[in-house]
């Protein structure tokens, strides 16, 4: 395989020299310190804490969770209380010193206050072991110290996770200020050979590292054009300022989800005439990504066309746990290598490829693994790569001894130096702590004096494509949502939307007894985001036609109830497969008929597929039944179909809930009539097409759109109805319960009602909450699909200490949402479903203005049923908007 061929080539050409250099580097990092340094190291409490956490996994988890929460806590009592709660977990084995610190009963007591002060100071000290400073003055001191040690730097501003446009604008301004301050300071520096001068060429004395997602709060691969426009507008300002001041800009790489769009934006921007000849720019690649080698090949080809070199910083990657968990949660292919050795091998392959193309690229080798750095040294020395085109990089606070050894060898070493306050720096700190305490960490293994021969051995991997396999085995696997970061998938989605728009305005007939029938009346289903756009005309059955459907269902039930469960289940599985095949088309129909943005529509289709497959598997499991025998008795427990099921589905989840209720009734042997909400009748017609194609027999399933007050009531009250499945408002649901309870002439059974009705959901934000996560989660829950879900966050209850800060960020984050037509990839929130809903929500907003304080209201576009995201503050529990379900984008902050 390719990986083995590359491995052999590296061994043959560079391995001997790599081993020699690596051995020397490790010996130098293990060199004995003088007695004072050894005493100082033994007394360092932060190293002791890391030793404790490494020895106890339970302590490590709880300690890192607590450290992550500290910046949000605003009093010593809160800190003491949280520390006690985290450290009292059963899995935690504490050293005696820490046990004494949590032995208090009152968080306000003197021992607790003392513990809190000690803990706070300790965490700050630990943080600034890895963070270069809290402000520019401290950072400049750090840079001066690095330069005296023969090293240079790149500065990274902590807190790049922006959730508002105000924060994105502030991020840009902070970098503009930073490079100006650093440039002023650099005027006092004398240029040093090796770090400021190489091969007779001056190297910028100022370098900063930036992340693209921080330049636009709505950065989204599904919206590449809009994201690129916003990001590039701000990047051009930064690049022009950097050119004016002579500063270098390096672009960091973030999560895999953003990688392709990040590379696309940079490749296009840096080909613009204004920036094409700039050589003081750089791009980062992460070797733990399976497609990173191909990315490097692509960058090499692009740089050749560009005609001017730039730097590629090669790192292994800092988000392995996050990438792995996200891929498992979404049932996507794992983007990162599962084995550390595979990452190390790929890093070596990429190092060789990068350095062997030094005529086109500058290489920055970022690693704390001595072997990785030694290989780079060996290749550079063998190929006689000019010093300007090659440098080593380490993280601030990590690999210090390695960096010093590399400087002694004559290499340029650049230290990646984050700076900022503790709160925005906490995520960075946790990543560093995880890296330092991981069993596979090279730094940890070297500190534990693992044999040199083992530390510098070549990485051995049987299969570079070895992926994580979930050991859980079930008869059901979730359908993965679409990953819109994939260009090919995104193009399919765009093409499907174009195709569906060409099919708008068609007529859809009811399906009764296997035949599509004519009706006297038709309903126009329109796009709520463009109310003049006809999605489809849907035939509305009469009461007489509803009776025909009941007769057909009753006749079909005789054979359907005897159909083996496996046969019924196979129809559902076929339906699920058809949904998967038509996923992008179905997404487009959902988007256009009910105003749901594409990713939300996609999640709904996944859920519908899951219903088909899960219920199929469950029915096969349940069919066998169970014996509950007693002495002298044979007792058989089994399920049998009830009869005719009437499904009344909602418009807010028009495909998922309609599918779930319908296929559950069908697979259990019941003949089913689907009466959808009027505003989502076309989507229900698409479900009908799928079930028919899947092989559902005539009369077993029937599509019966009609007026709820007539057809719906008739079906609910019909004597032959056995089961009613309903999702909708509490008012209608309660009426169905009441009507179903009435026995009709000739009715020999009691009806079963399965009703999911409205609700009033809330999110509680306490004083230890990560406000980045809390604000983003509330915005998504409250305004996703315009709040038209019973699960939407319509109330957020915030602890007093963080209330004002939370509200301010919540308002700014909501302001950053784009409201408009759901098929526009720039948009995060569409319209509400119809004019009736719009007018009802406006009435609630009017009441809210009378009772509470309006914190936010925005403008909306014309042409659809739009309601702006609306936030009220100062809401009391007895206020109308705090008590009643609004079913719209209205949020009460309490």
Model segments located where?
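Glycine-rich loop-to-alpha-helix module at the N-terminal edge of alpha/beta enzyme cores
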Residues: 531-623
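ALDH superfamily catalytic-core signature
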Residues: 690-695, 717-718, 723, 731-877
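Rossmann-like NAD(P) dinucleotide-binding subdomain of oxidoreductase/dehydrogenase enzymes
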Residues: 619-773
């Amino acid at each position: 395989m390719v990986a083995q061929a590359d491995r052999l080539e590296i061994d043959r050409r560079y391995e001997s020299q790599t081993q020699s250099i690596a051995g020397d580097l490790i010996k130098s990092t293990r060199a004995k310190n003088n007695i004072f340094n050894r005493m100082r190291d033994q007394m360092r409490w932060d190293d002791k804490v890391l030793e404790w956490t490494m020895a106890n996994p339970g302590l490590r988890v709880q300690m890192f969770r607590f450290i992550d929460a500290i910046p949000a806590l605003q009093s010593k009592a809160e800190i003491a209380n949280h520390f006690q709660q985290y450290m009292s977990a059963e899995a935690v084995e504490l050293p005696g010193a820490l046990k004494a610190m949590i032995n208090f009963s009152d968080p306000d007591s003197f021992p607790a206050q003392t513990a809190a002060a000690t803990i706070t100071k300790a965490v700050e000290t630990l943080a600034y072991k890895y963070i270069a400073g809290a402000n520019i003055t401290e950072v400049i001191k750090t840079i001066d110290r690095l330069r005296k040690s023969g090293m240079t730097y790149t500065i990274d501003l902590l807190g790049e996770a922006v959730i508002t446009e105000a924060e994105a604008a502030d991020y840009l301004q902070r970098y503009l200020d930073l490079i100006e301050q650093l440039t002023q300071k650099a005027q006092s520096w004398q240029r040093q050979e090796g770090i400021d001068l190489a091969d007779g060429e001056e190297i910028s004395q100022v370098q900063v590292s930036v992340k693209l997602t921080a330049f636009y709060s709505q950065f989204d691969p599904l919206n590449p054009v809009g994201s690129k426009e916003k990001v590039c507008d701000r990047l051009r300002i930064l690049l022009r300022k950097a050119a004016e001041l002579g500063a270098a800009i390096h672009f960091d790489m973030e999560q895999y989800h953003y990688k392709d769009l990040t590379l696309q934006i940079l490749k296009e921007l840096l080909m613009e005439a204004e920036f094409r000849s700039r050589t003081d720019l750089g791009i980062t690649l992460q070797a733990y990504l399976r497609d990173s080698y191909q990315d490097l090949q692509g960058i090499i080809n692009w740089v050749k066309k560009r005609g001017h070199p730039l730097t590629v910083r090669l790192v292994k990657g800092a988000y392995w746990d996050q990438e792995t968990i996200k891929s498992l949660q979404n049932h996507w292919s794992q983007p990162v290598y599962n084995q550390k050795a595979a990452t190390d091998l790929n890093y070596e392959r990429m190092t060789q490829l990068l350095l062997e193309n030094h005529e086109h690229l500058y290489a920055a080798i970022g690693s704390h693994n001595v072997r990785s750095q030694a290989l780079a040294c060996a290749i550079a020395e063998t190929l006689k790569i000019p010093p300007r085109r090659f440098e080593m990089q380490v993280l601030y606070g990590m690999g210090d001894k390695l960096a010093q050894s590399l400087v002694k060898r004559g290499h340029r070493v650049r230290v990646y130096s984050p700076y900022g306050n503790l709160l925005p720096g906490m995520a960075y700190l946790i990543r560093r702590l995880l890296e330092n305490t991981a069993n596979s960490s090279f730094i940890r293994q070297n500190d534990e004096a693992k044999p040199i021969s083992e530390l510098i051995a070549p990485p051995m991997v049987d299969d570079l494509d070895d992926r994580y396999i979930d050991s859980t085995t079930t008869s059901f696997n979730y359908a993965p949502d679409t990953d819109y970061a994939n260009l090919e998938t995104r193009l399919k989605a765009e093409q499907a939307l174009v195709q569906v728009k060409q099919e708008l305005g068609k007529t859809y007939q009811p399906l009764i007894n296997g035949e599509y029938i004519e009706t006297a009346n038709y309903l126009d289903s329109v796009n709520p985001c463009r109310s003049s756009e006809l999605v489809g005309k849907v035939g509305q059955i009469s009461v007489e036609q509803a009776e025909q459907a009941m007769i057909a269902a009753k006749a079909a039930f005789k054979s359907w109830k005897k159909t083996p469960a496996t046969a019924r289940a196979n129809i559902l599985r076929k339906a699920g497969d058809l949904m998967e095949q038509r996923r992008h088309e179905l997404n487009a129909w959902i988007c256009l008929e009910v105003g749901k943005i594409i990713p939300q529509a996609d999640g709904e289709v996944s859920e519908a597929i899951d219903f088909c497959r899960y219920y199929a598997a469950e029915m096969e499991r349940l069919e066998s039944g169970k014996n509950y025998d007693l002495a002298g008795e044979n007792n058989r427990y089994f399920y049998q179909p009830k009869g005719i099921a009437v499904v009344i589905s909602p418009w807010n989840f028009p495909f998922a809930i309609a599918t779930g209720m319908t296929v559950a009734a069908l697979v259990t042997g019941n003949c089913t009539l689907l009466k959808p909400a009027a505003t989502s009748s076309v989507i229900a017609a698409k479900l009908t097409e799928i079930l028919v194609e899947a092989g559902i027999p005539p009369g077993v399933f029937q599509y019966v759109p009609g007026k709820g007050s007539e057809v719906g009531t008739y079906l609910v009250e019909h004597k032959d109805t056995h089961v009613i499945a309903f999702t909708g408002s509490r008012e209608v649901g309660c009426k169905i319960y009441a009507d179903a309870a009435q026995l009709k002439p000739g009715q020999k059974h009691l009806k079963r009602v399965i009703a999911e009705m409205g609700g009033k959901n809330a999110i509680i934000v306490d004083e230890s909450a990560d406000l980045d996560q809390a604000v983003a989660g509330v915005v998504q829950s409250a305004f996703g699909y315009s709040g038209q879900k019973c699960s939407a966050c319509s109330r957020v209850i915030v602890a007093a200490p963080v209330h004002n800060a939370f509200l301010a960020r919540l308002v700014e984050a909501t302001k950053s949402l784009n409201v408009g037509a759901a098929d526009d990839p720039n948009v995060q929130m569409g319209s509400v479903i119809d004019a009736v809903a719009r007018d009802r929500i406006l009435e609630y907003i009017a009441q809210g203005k009378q009772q509470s304080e309006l914190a936010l209201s925005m403008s909306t576009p014309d042409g659809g049923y739009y309601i702006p995201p609306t936030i009220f503050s100062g809401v009391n529990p007895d206020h109308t908007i705090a008590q009643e379900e609004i079913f719209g984008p209205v949020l009460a902050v309490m």
